[in-house]
């Protein structure tokens, strides 16, 4: 019997088939449709214009700048600048200053302490945590937490919103049931630079 610790989960970008692959694998082929799937982590230290499609993690360093049509990954950690539509199967964490162009779709969305970031397109997440200044529109099918140093300047549509003492919400707050949030506005592609 094989132990679970030697395997990791993977999902095909093309057909959506979920399967297990070796923990140290850098790539895999989907057993259902045969499509190639990258499992490697990507780190951006300088300017890049390549679209990213991996089931690994993406790290954008402080001096990194990503201008691409799309980013598909497991977890995203951004300390630099990103101009792309982002789809994460896990967390999207931001600790940067400046403007982010492109829609963000993820499970957990976090703006860490020290950030001051403006999202020019909407953010769609299951769980949202804001510990710094954020400008933009948030759609969450779960809770939104605004920490004591957190501030959201923009509209929030969520299942629940919690604001710790010292936190701010400057905009409309819509509390709805989870299924209604899926009817948010359609995606608008970012302008090509």
Where do the protein language model's features map onto the residues?
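A short beta-strand motif that forms part of the nucleic acid-binding face
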Residues: 82, 98, 115, 134, ...
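Extended interfacial segments that mediate partner engagement and assembly in macromolecular machines
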Residues: 44-111, 120-124
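Intrinsically disordered, glycine/charged-rich N-terminal periplasmic/extracytoplasmic linker segments
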Residues: 90, 96, 102-105, 130, ...
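Intrinsically disordered, low-complexity terminal regions
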Residues: 1-67, 77, 120, 129, ...
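Long, polar low-complexity repeats
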Residues: 107-136, 142-144
């Amino acid at each position: 019997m094989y132990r679970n610790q030697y395997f990791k989960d993977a999902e095909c970008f093309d057909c959506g088939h979920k399967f297990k692959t070796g923990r140290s694998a850098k790539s895999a082929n989907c057993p259902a449709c045969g499509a190639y799937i990258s499992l490697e982590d990507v780190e951006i230290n300088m300017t890049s214009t390549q679209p990213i499609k991996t089931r690994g993690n993406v790290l954008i360093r402080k001096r990194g700048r990503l201008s691409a049509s799309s980013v598909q990954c497991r977890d995203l950690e951004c300390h630099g600048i990103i101009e792309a539509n982002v789809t994460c199967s896990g967390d999207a964490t931001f600790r940067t200053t400046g403007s982010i162009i492109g829609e963000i779709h993820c499970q957990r969305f976090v703006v860490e302490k020290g950030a001051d970031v403006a999202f020019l397109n909407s953010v769609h997440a299951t769980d949202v945590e804001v510990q710094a200044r954020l400008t933009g529109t948030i759609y969450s099918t779960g809770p939104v937490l605004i920490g004591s140093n957190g501030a959201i300047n923009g509209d929030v549509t969520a299942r629940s919103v919690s604001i710790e003492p010292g936190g701010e919400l400057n905009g409309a707050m819509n509390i709805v049931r989870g299924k209604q949030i899926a009817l948010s506005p359609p995606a608008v592609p970012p302008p090509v630079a």
